[in-house]
Amino acid sequence: IFEYVPNKYSVTDENLKTSDAIEIKIGQATKPGMGGLLPGDKVTPEIAKVRGKKAGEDIISPSRFPNINSKKDLKDLVDELRLKSEGRPIGIKIAAGYIENDLEFISYAKPDFITVDGRGGATGASPLLVRDSTSIPTIFALHRARKYLDEHDLDIDLVITGGLRVSSDFAKALAMGADAIAIASASLIAVACQQYRLCDKGQCPVGVATQDKELRSRLKTDIGAKRLTNYLNASLEEIKTFARITGTAASIVSKIILPFSMIAPS
């Protein structure tokens, strides 16, 4: 999924067309209402080329889209991305805050999916004060989002994320009405992350969040890929078990397990 952010990292027509989907990032639960900063010492020539920026200079991502000031503005962007990407699914991601008000606003744009990011998710680069004190916990956010979409008869897929780590978390989210679950930190941990929380320093000792050549050499991508595959496949099998013991196997298989199988090869 191509994440479309305010400063338009790596936005080209080709990238939009070759993505599986495009997600307009309005907010993130660990730092709602805040932008982002990639320090210049992490902007290597390789990163600069990918992001269309100058090597060695800080890259600042604004906290909001300057061209989105109304429902119509957001709808225009969704329509534009749908056209440029030749029909790729377009989603909108929000931090779990004013959920009902936010859903009312963004549903006007008629996205294909909405991602609600609840408190409990993580990034090693968020201020602790904000990360630990803002946004609505994921499960409560899911309940409110599902309720709103159902009450307003909105045919928009609901993706939930934020602190969901293991199969029982995924099964609970599906049972509560999520159409899909997005995972981030859990995937990084499966690959190699040991949560040293040095992501913003460029000194990750296991080589996951760094551009240092020596540190990067410690990350064995073939092993990490295998571990991630094992994590996804094990989660899939455990979701099947939850589906069987709750008598929902048929609906879960058609809705979740078949697509999941496609992204978790053996």
What are the functions of these language-model segments?
Residues 58-65, 129, 219-226:
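Short coil/turn segments at secondary-structure junctions
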Residues 192, 219-259, 263-266:
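C-terminal extensions of enzymes
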Residues 30-34, 152, 205-240:
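Extended, intrinsically disordered, low-complexity segments
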Residues 65-216:
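Glycine-rich phosphate/ribose-binding loops and adjacent secondary-structure elements
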Residues 38, 42-45, 60, 194, ...:
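Residue-level signal for pocket-adjacent positions within structured domains
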Residues 61, 65, 169, 237-243:
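Amphipathic, soluble alpha/beta structural segments
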Residues 1-80, 84-107:
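Active-site-facing alpha/beta catalytic cores
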Residues 7, 29, 52, 79, ...:
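Generic secondary-structure signature for well-ordered alpha-helical cores
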